[in-house]
A protein has these predicted regions:
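Short, catalytically relevant binding-site loops at active-site mouths
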Residues: 141-143, 160-163
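Accessory, usually C-terminal, subdomains that scaffold auxiliary metal cofactors
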Residues: 151, 156, 162-191
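Electropositive, gly/pro-rich neighborhoods at or near active sites that engage anionic ligands
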Residues: 1-154
Length: 191
């Protein structure tokens, strides 16, 4: 079942917690990293070094893979590639849904770009307007404060290395482990 922007807004309007987990070509490559030595090497070169900026140990790669599987198993909705030019993209983009499906416990999907689509058309910021608390995790700063939000808690993760010259703390395990502790400290009524 494919959900539209309006469907996602309706889900958000229920005011119940919802988990929307992204599944892109990098996630597909990580999920397949235990298929063969070639798959593992592709994961290291195309995802870990390129996106994260370093080569984690084999056990860390497997832990990341298992965390992805847990995320898909616990997701309410999974964001998958739905670009108009999907047929023209590489096999990793085209095969995302098939690779993630065995790990998912939901059949609800939406566009991998749903957050950006809603951010750019204004519907996401409108939905957040006047919320008492917003807790979000992102490598980008979103101007929620201008929406009259009383409290904004932002855990800023490292950006993808391929887009920046970032040399700070590693995504995994450093930031990953701190996020759970950070979330525990945030207001429970956050959105």
């Amino acid at each position: 079942m494919t959900l539209t922007q309006d469907d996602i807004l309706n889900v958000l309007n229920t005011a119940r917690p919802v988990s929307i987990v992204r599944a892109g070509d990098g996630e597909k490559i990580v999920l397949e990293s235990n298929n063969s030595i070639e798959s593992y090497q592709l994961c290291i070169q195309s995802v870990m070094k390129r996106q994260m900026g370093y080569e984690p140990t084999m056990s860390e790669v497997e832990a990341i893979r298992q965390n992805l599987i847990s995320a898909y198993q616990g997701a309410d909705i999974i964001g998958i590639p739905m670009q108009k030019n999907l047929a023209e993209l590489n096999k990793h983009w085209k095969g995302v849904a098939d690779t993630v499906k065995p790990h998912a416990t939901t059949n609800k999907t939406c566009s991998i770009d749903i957050f950006y689509d809603m951010l750019y058309d204004g519907s996401l910021l409108e939905w957040f307007k006047d919320k008492p608390v917003i807790n979000y995790i992102s490598c980008r700063k979103i101007p929620f404060e201008r929406l009259l939000v009383k409290q904004v808690n932002h855990f800023q993760i490292a950006p993808e290395v391929k887009f920046t010259s970032y040399t700070g703390e590693h995504h995994y395990p450093d930031q990953f482990n701190r996020i759970e502790r950070w979330m525990d400290k945030c207001a429970i009524e956050g959105h």
